[in-house]
Amino acid sequence: MGGRSSCEDPGCPRDEERAPRMGCMKSKFLQVGGNTFSKTETSASPHCPVYVPDPTSTIKPGPNSHNSNTPGIREAGSEDIIVVALYDYEAIHHEDLSFQKGDQMVVLEESGEWWKARSLATRKEGYIPSNYVARVDSLETEEWFFKGISRKDAERQLLAPGNMLGSFMIRDSETTKGSYSLSVRDYDPRQGDTVKHYKIRTLDNGGFYISPRSTFSTLQELVDHYKKGNDGLCQKLSVPCMSSKPQKPWEKDAWEIPRESLKLEKKLGAGQFGEVWMATYNKHTKVAVKTMKPGSMSVEAFLAEANVMKTLQHDKLVKLHAVVTKEPIYIITEFMAKGSLLDFLKSDEGSKQPLPKLIDFSAQIAEGMAFIEQRNYIHRDLRAANILVSASLVCKIADFGLARVIEDNEYTAREGAKFPIKWTAPEAINFGSFTIKSDVWSFGILLMEIVTYGRIPYPGMSNPEVIRALERGYRMPRPENCPEELYNIMMRCWKNRPEERPTFEYIQSVLDDFYTATESQYQQQP
């Protein structure tokens, strides 16, 4: 499979303004046939299609790996890691291992998102997507257990179409490490469909309880008990929350890919610096491809930034899969069925979304930006056009960091026709000072876009008029349908002094609990 490059630079998540040398992956830039392209030091001949390893990939050999000299391997005789398939998987690469739901496999090597495994039934070996399996006898094999999901995402999933009264999940507690919470779909005549949460407490002997009068030695027993009757809960437990099969991980070792591996099928839109296409990668994976106009950025600067963008992985950020580094540069990302949030809000479906859903979109974006903030990164071009929407109405942030490497004066100079003046903080317009706090200003404008269903900010005003108005202290007025509390967040985002603007972490906490701030998020013991 060739050598893989891992991010060994502890400075990967870096300070707000970075030195020109960016990225975690050491690449060489070669001149071949007049074209500059990048390859790692272990790549094949420059004349055949080049696949360069993922900069985020790491190898962790399993206890059953044959290489006994590999650091980190367990002593001989250590227990095998046996996993069970949670879903069916049909091999799409020649080194993959197909399996059916319920099949058991022994893990030979844990390497990023693809693990090498051997089927216990067929003895065949190959790579398996790690998010399709779970350790045998672990809670993850239970259909009602949702690992690593937040309280807010539990509510989003339980309230999604297809679930019913009493649909439930058990998840890891966000606040108490090693503890669990039970989330149940309920109905309230005042609020409509709602979700109630119960803390699952632990006994000294390892048992579990919600109410001290009913204790259980396992979570399975607890679930069985509350399926028979509600016994103080809001509802009797009915069926586990519906869950869709997770996205397959991107192909192993395919970071810099040849253009021939992509078939562009449908043009989805055109922006200032190129086009966006729906495409198929290697005849098997649907993706989105952003094609950049030649000359819009330097290949070296783009690749360095892309190597860092690749390490920023979060549910509310669009997944960056791969790049084509010969001009025209291609950026390959996950496909988002509903397109940009701006287009969605203006569509028939989007324009019918009620205010609570608009607040939920805002909370999802704030969550993604809180992650970017925590990683000391900056977006630089946050607006509804750069948020993408999935089929299940999950909002994800796109194009983070891309503005940094654009070399078009029309975009980089404040007088330029493409410079997004109406979204840009005054200190970034006047002094080129882009920080996470200038992103917070842009988020305030994005909130206004959302609550007005995609209306252009500062309607009727030209860019120079906006700059002059801001200097006089003007701020957009509150739209009729906008709650005071939401407008207050916008006004805090638009404070003149960057340090007085809130953090994204704070904004997320307010938006997550916009309708529940006055009541406890967890039910009292029944």
Swiss-Prot record:
Basic and acidic residues bias locations: 11-20
Modified residues (Phosphoserine): S462
Enzyme class label: transferase
Keyword Lipoprotein included in the entry's annotation: yes
GO MF entries: ATP binding; lipid binding; non-membrane spanning protein tyrosine kinase activity; phosphotyrosine residue binding; protein tyrosine kinase activity; signaling receptor binding
EC number(s) recorded for this UniProt protein: 2.7.10.2
An annotated GO BP: regulation of actin cytoskeleton organization
UniProt activity-regulation remark: Subject to autoinhibition, mediated by intramolecular interactions involving the SH2 and SH3 domains. Kinase activity is also regulated by phosphorylation at regulatory tyrosine residues. Phosphorylation at Tyr-411 is required for optimal activity. Phosphorylation at Tyr-522 inhibits kinase activity. Inhibited by PP1 and A-770041.
Catalyzed chemical reaction(s): L-tyrosyl-[protein] + ATP = O-phospho-L-tyrosyl-[protein] + ADP + H(+)
Localization, UniProt: Cytoplasmic vesicle, Secretory vesicle; Cytoplasm, Cytosol
The protein's assembly and partners: Interacts (via SH2 domain) with FLT3 (tyrosine phosphorylated). Interacts with VAV1, WAS and RAPGEF1. This interaction stimulates its tyrosine-kinase activity. Interacts with ARRB1 and ARRB2. Interacts with ADAM15. Interacts with FASLG. Interacts with CBL. Interacts with FCGR1A; the interaction may be indirect. Interacts with IL6ST. Interacts (via SH3 domain) with ELMO1. Interacts (via SH3 domain) with TP73. Interacts with YAP1. Interacts with ABL1 and ITGB1, and thereby recruits ABL1 to activated ITGB1. Interacts (via SH3 domain) with WDCP.
Functional description taken from the UniProt entry: Non-receptor tyrosine-protein kinase found in hematopoietic cells that transmits signals from cell surface receptors and plays an important role in the regulation of innate immune responses, including neutrophil, monocyte, macrophage and mast cell functions, phagocytosis, cell survival and proliferation, cell adhesion and migration. Acts downstream of receptors that bind the Fc region of immunoglobulins, such as FCGR1A and FCGR2A, but also CSF3R, PLAUR, the receptors for IFNG, IL2, IL6 and IL8, and integrins, such as ITGB1 and ITGB2.
Name of the molecule in the record: Tyrosine-protein kinase HCK
Annotated source species: Homo sapiens (Human)
